[in-house]
Amino acid sequence: MKKIINKKSETFLEKYLNNASPTGFEWEGQKVWLDYLKPYIDDHYVDNYGTAVGVINPNAEYKVVIEAHADEISWFVHYITKEGFIYVCRNGGSDHLIAPSMRVNIHTKKGIVKAVFGWPAIHTRHEKEETPSMKNIFLDCGVDSKEAVEALGVHVGCVVTFQDEFMIMQGNKYVGRALDNRIGGFMIAEVTRLLHENKVKLPYSLHVVNAVQEEIGLRGAQMIAQRIQPHLAIVTDVCHDTGSPMMNKIQQGDTVSGKGPVLTYGPAVQNNVLNMIIENAENAKIPYQRAAVSRSTGTDTDAFAYSNDGVPSALISLPLRYMHTTVEMAHKDDVENCIRLIYETLLNVQSGQGFKYF
C-alpha cells in the first residue's frame, strides 16, 4: 500500500508531541494542531474550554464527527515546604511509580522552571523499602526555601509535565510522552489532509474534533457533542498493546502492535456503525483486531454515544505500549492503517444515512 505519512507529517507530529498540553491547559498544543489543519478545511472554531474543531462542507445538514482528545496527564503543584521541596497532586491518571528521577517542566507565567522528582539514594534506604506514592514523591527545583521557589514564579496550581522527547526507533516505532492521545489528533489531521489532497467532495459536513479534558472524565467531548449534535461519530484513541511483558491477555485481551487498528465491541458502540467500519476494512484490505469492553469504553466514544438522545458512535483504537509513561510506543504501520481506515470509512458514508437496528 502507498505510504501516507510523509516528512512534513512527521515534522508536525514531533512539534505537536513536544508541545505540552496538560489537561485544562491544552491551548498551546491546540494552536499547533489547528495551524496544521487550516489549509485542509473550510472553517474552524474553538469552544470556551479549548476544544478545537475543523469543518469541511459546513453548510451541509448531515454532520459526521471524527474525534481525538488533545490533553495529556500531568501534575499540579500542591504544597511547597519551607525548605523549597514541592509536593504534587495528579491532573489525570499520572503514575506515581514512574516519577522518581524524572525531569519535569513547571509551567509558570514567567516561563518554564526546570525541576526533578527526587528520591533517596539506594545506599540510604532501609531494608523494607518505601515504594513511590503520592505521599512521598516530591519535586526539587534547585533552591532551598519556599520564598526562592515562589520567586521563580512557582505557586500552588502551577501545572507540571514530564520533559518533552519524541523519537523514532528502528524506523517504525513512535516513542514519547503524550501519544495518548495526541497521536489520535495527528491521525485525524492526516485524514483531513488526504481528503483535501485527493479532492474528495463529501456529501455531508465533516467536523474534525480535537477535544480537551478526556483524561479527567471525557469533559471536552461532552461539551462539544452538545454543540455539534452530530448524526455519526467515529472516535479514535489508544488501547493497550498486550504483547509486552507483564501484560495478562486473559484480563486485558489480545491486541498487539503491528497487527492493525483495534475495533471495540461494547454497549456504547453502535453495532451497525461498527459493522460498516469492519466492511470497509475488509474491502480495503486493512488489517484490524477486535477488543471487547464489559461496560464503558473509557474513551470519548461514551460521551458522544450518550449525547443528544444517542449518537451512533464507534471506536477505532491504536495499540500502545507503556501507556501513561514517558516512553509510550506505537507502531507506524498501525498509525497509517488507522488513518487509512477512517479515510475509507468516510468515503462510504452517505448523507442522511441512518443506523437504527429496526
Language-model features: locations:
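N-terminal hydrophobic/helix-forming segments and targeting peptides
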Residues: M1-F358
